[in-house]
Amino acid sequence: MNEKIAILSAYSFVNIEEPANLIPKLLLLGKRKYIRGTILLANEGFNGSFSGSYENVNLVLEELIKLTGPKDVNVKINYSDVHPFQKLKVRLKKEIIAMNVDDLNVDLFKGEYIEPKDWDEFITKQDVIVIDTRNDYEVEVGTFKSAINPNTKTFKQFPAWVQQNQELLKGKKIAMVCTGGIRCEKSTSLLKSIGYNEVYHLKGGILQYLEDTQNKNNLWQGECFVFDDRRAVTDDLSPVERHWLQR
């Protein structure tokens, strides 16, 4: 029986002084360990999704942590019968998730986590609004029943949407959701930095929620878009078999 391919996603907002210096080391290790996927590096941290054997993806993660020294890392592992990526890329970026807001300190301004097991109860409270921080083509594939869709084409448009919808957000507990946690974490940082106090986000994102809860209350509708060759996954995280999604 062939070993399943492990797909490891990890991010951390941590200050990296010279991120470019890490690229050769990570490329060399990744290629030696037959890793495929993408790792983004910036002064604000790292964000990666890569595949290989379970042992090897964890070796790469350990090296990434050793090189950057984060206090905490958000990690998610799924499995597939095949590699969902074509090759390994390690790239230097201005931001690990591009929002185009200067001097946003995610470590200093960050919302509170809601654990997947508590999410359904939390978002059904009357004073809570849910915002899906993903792009419109992702939300179209699937989202939570009560979620507001900002209809953004890119995450860079999200700050403008916030500015235009302050009345909608005023006096509410704001719950942010995204695929794996990074966009909702940065979104809560934006809102906290401009004065919103009761800001929350789904720990581990939609993928962790589906794994932990199996969507038992049917608050999630549709499938979850993913940025690899699987294109989308169902509530049990199986790849969607039909190839209807075009970008």
Curated annotation (Swiss-Prot):
Keywords from the UniProt entry: Oxidoreductase, tRNA processing
SUPFAM superfamilies in alphabetical order: Rhodanese/Cell cycle control phosphatase
An example Gene Ontology molecular-function term: oxidoreductase activity, acting on paired donors, with incorporation or reduction of molecular oxygen
UniProt keyword annotation of Repeat present: no
Family matches, as InterPro entries: Rhodanese-like_dom, Rhodanese-like_dom_sf, TrhO, TRHO_N
GO BP, sorted A to Z: tRNA modification
Top EC category: oxidoreductase
UniProt EC number: 1.14.-.-
Span of domain Rhodanese: 124-218
Similarity comment: family membership: Belongs to the TrhO family.
Listed name of the protein: tRNA uridine(34) hydroxylase
